[in-house]
């Protein structure tokens, strides 16, 4: 499109010199405001309770803002109560009512305090942005209250009259809730989720609901996310993998309650085929404190084994279908002597199997599903493909997700940029084309986008779906980054060498500054000002590991939000914050501690990089877009003045 055509389109939105000039003034003013605070989280793994607490408290930042605003003018108890109210207004209001404390005095004081906190939080934003973030039904009222200068006696009376009206017409509860939610919203300008929303934890669906409500968010796909996407799009092996992952943690809620996945046929198959099998190797992990009967746990173990065997068959079929995946050495089912219970590894070494009961496996054709297994797979897959709630969440994931993202000089991706030991980028060849570094990530981005839009009868569809399995656990997958995933070996083989998953050299090299710089150059980024931000590998804080390396250029922010990893990390996750003053890492305590100390909770915050001067919007990606629009509007004004384009004042 040439420049004149573009300016004519722009003229439809700004049809006069006055309107274009007004927009330039507005944009110029906006560009010199401080940049908003970005929050980075990774590896949520369905841990909705911890995630929601972190988000609603702005990673403890709300409590800090309350201290800054009120200092010693309010008691610690009152400040804690205010913090709790902001985090969970409905619950705290109900408690206040139960204690007969929901009085006119409490309402007036609370609204006044909340307005002060909201003013502090909103101070870095334009008035228009705050209005846009406010629900329309209270937009004018809250805007008025936020901009009243209390020093004037008349204004104080005016403010008190507004409070009187709120109380008189009995909307105080709804108004307080709205203020609290506005503070929550304004505290986080943008949220980056660096992969792995799904698996392990009970309710990834609740996390997705929170993200959809937030909107100002982006997501980088983790390997646990792409296997769910594959399941949703119709991949049998990914559907089985998702179900197996959930059952392995005795987590039926995420499947049945979250997305309505039908496990009835799987339950029946487990009872019929494994009725006399104790399934010792398939005992499920218990993370909650609820009591579980031995019968329920045994049944879960049998379901776990049943779906695992189906998955192994489908996985081996996939290896055979896709020789370019270079995983033919993973055809482990064909290396089993079922009669004698012996497995031969890729080097020919024999190992006794830890479990020799395979009632659904034909030793002469171990990759073939039985009719009952086929029925189970089709039923489960249909559930994934027809779940309305899953469709809503996957549509959001497609719209806001990507393999990687560059945002304000930060390179975000979940796992790794596959590398060789010498620091060169590892190559992946497919259909005679070779990909590495940035082009490899772009290749997988293309696979995801094309698979989403393929018809069921597309001849390339099966291969596209198989790639979601490769992204889950392929040796050159940037979401995975290991030589293999040893699910089969962990169930059946004792030898730790056979079980070993070798990590890609990236994970050690990225901690060295020169290799981080090499990655920045691959993505056309300035090594002097850029950062790598990823998750995937839990940082064992308990052993002294640090989330920041490469002279402050590489951040790994998987600190164990997922309860399943908290014993390994010793903490309950990291949040990286990027505000106008600095980059900082917040180290979170476990969720039980967060709950027990209520509004007093603040994480341990370490500033990792201070900026020489305050960063303004004009210094960000948004600022570049604003500058471009200002230049375009100036060109439009020139076109109006020269007569090249006619103004339209009608």
Swiss-Prot record:
It is an enzyme of class 3 (hydrolase). Pathway: Carbohydrate biosynthesis; gluconeogenesis. It catalyses: beta-D-fructose 1,6-bisphosphate + H2O = beta-D-fructose 6-phosphate + phosphate. Keywords: Carbohydrate metabolism, Hydrolase, Manganese. Its cofactor is Mn(2+). One of its GO terms (molecular function) is fructose 1,6-bisphosphate 1-phosphatase activity. SUPFAM superfamilies: Metallo-dependent phosphatases (SSF56300). InterPro entries: FBPtase_class3, Metallo-depent_PP-like. Signal peptide: none annotated. The keyword Manganese applies. GO terms for biological process: gluconeogenesis. Its EC number is 3.1.3.11. Belongs to the FBPase class 3 family. This is Fructose-1,6-bisphosphatase class 3. It comes from Finegoldia magna (strain ATCC 29328 / DSM 20472 / WAL 2508). The gene is fbp.
């Amino acid at each position: 499109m040439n420049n004149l055509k573009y300016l004519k389109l722009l003229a439809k939105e700004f049809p006069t010199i006055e309107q274009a000039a007004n927009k330039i003034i507005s944009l110029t003013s906006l560009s010199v405001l401080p940049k908003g605070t970005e929050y980075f989280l990774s590896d949520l793994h369905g841990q909705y309770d911890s995630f929601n607490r972190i988000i609603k408290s702005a990673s403890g930042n709300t409590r800090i803002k309350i201290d800054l605003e009120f200092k010693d003018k309010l008691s610690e108890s009152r400040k804690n109560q205010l913090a709790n109210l902001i985090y969970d207004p409905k619950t705290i209001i109900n408690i206040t009512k139960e204690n007969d404390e929901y009085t006119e005095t409490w309402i007036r004081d609370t609204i006044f305090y909340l307005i002060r906190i909201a003013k502090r939080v909103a101070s870095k934003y334009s008035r228009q942005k705050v209005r846009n973030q406010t629900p329309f039904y209270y937009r004018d009222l809250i805007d008025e209250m936020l901009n009243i200068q209390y020093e004037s006696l008349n204004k104080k009376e005016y403010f008190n009259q507004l409070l009187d009206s709120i109380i008189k017409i009995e909307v105080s509860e709804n108004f307080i809730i709205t203020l609290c939610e506005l503070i929550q919203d304004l505290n986080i300008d943008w949220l980056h989720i660096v992969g792995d929303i799904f698996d392990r934890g009970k309710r990834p669906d609740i996390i997705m609901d929170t993200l959809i409500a937030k909107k100002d968010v982006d997501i980088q796909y983790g390997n646990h996310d792409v296997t769910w996407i594959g399941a949703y799009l119709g991949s049998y092996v990914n559907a089985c993998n998702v179900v197996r992952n959930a059952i392995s943690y005795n987590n039926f809620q995420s499947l049945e309650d979250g997305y309505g996945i039908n496990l009835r046929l799987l339950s029946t198959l487990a009872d019929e085929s494994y009725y006399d099998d104790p399934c010792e190797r398939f005992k499920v992990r218990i993370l909650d404190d609820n009591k579980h009967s031995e019968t329920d746990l045994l049944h879960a173990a049998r379901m776990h084994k049943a779906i695992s065997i189906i998955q192994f068959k489908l996985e081996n079929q996939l290896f055979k279908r896709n020789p370019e995946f270079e995983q033919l050495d993973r055809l482990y089912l064909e290396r089993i002597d079922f009669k004698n219970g012996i497995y031969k590894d890729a080097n020919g070494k024999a190992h006794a199997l830890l479990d020799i009961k395979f009632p659904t496996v034909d030793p002469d054709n171990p990759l073939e599903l039985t009719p009952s297994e086929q029925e189970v797979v089709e039923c489960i897959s249909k559930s994934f493909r027809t779940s309305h709630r899953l469709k809503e969440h996957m549509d959001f994931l497609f719209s806001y997700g990507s393999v990687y993202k560059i945002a304000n000089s930060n390179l975000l991706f979940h796992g790794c940029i596959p590398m060789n030991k010498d620091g060169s980028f590892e190559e992946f060849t497919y259909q005679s084309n070779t990909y590495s570094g940035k082009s490899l990530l772009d290749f997988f981005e293309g696979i995801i986008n094309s698979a989403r839009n393929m018809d069921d009868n597309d001849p390339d569809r099966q291969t596209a779906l198989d790639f979601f399995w490769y992204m889950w656990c392929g040796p050159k997958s940037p979401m995975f980054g290991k030589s293999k995933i040893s699910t089969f070996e962990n169930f059946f083989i004792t030898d730790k060498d056979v079980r070993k998953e070798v990590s890609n050299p990236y994970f050690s090299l990225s901690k060295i500054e020169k290799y981080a710089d090499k990655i920045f150059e691959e993505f056309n980024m300035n090594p002097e000002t850029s950062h790598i931000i990823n998750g995937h590998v839990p940082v064992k804080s308990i052993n002294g590991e640090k989330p920041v390396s490469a002279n402050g250029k590489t951040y790994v922010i998987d600190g164990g939000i997922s309860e399943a990893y908290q014993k390994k990390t010793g903490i309950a996750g990291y949040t990286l914050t990027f505000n106008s003053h600095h980059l900082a890492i917040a180290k979170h305590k476990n969720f039980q501690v967060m709950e027990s100390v209520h509004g007093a909770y603040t994480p341990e915050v370490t500033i990792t990089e201070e900026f020489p001067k305050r960063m303004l919007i004009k210094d960000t990606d948004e600022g570049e877009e604003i500058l471009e629009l200002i230049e375009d509007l100036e060109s439009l004004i020139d076109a109006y003045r020269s007569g090249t384009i006619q103004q339209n004042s009608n």
